[in-house]
């Protein structure tokens, strides 16, 4: 388990918003697990259709965090 963060710090804008274009390798959020901040990158290019987790919410391993419309 970990904690989902939508931005690099509380005063910053989110990494991504609904409707944003993202490229493979772009950081889309941070998940804190065991006091380590892990930057999560998107695996393929596309458009963010939905953010499925609220900021600062607990998340589990393999939980889906975003809905992405592939640009392939």
Labelled PLM ranges:
Residues 1-72:
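Structured functional modules or segments
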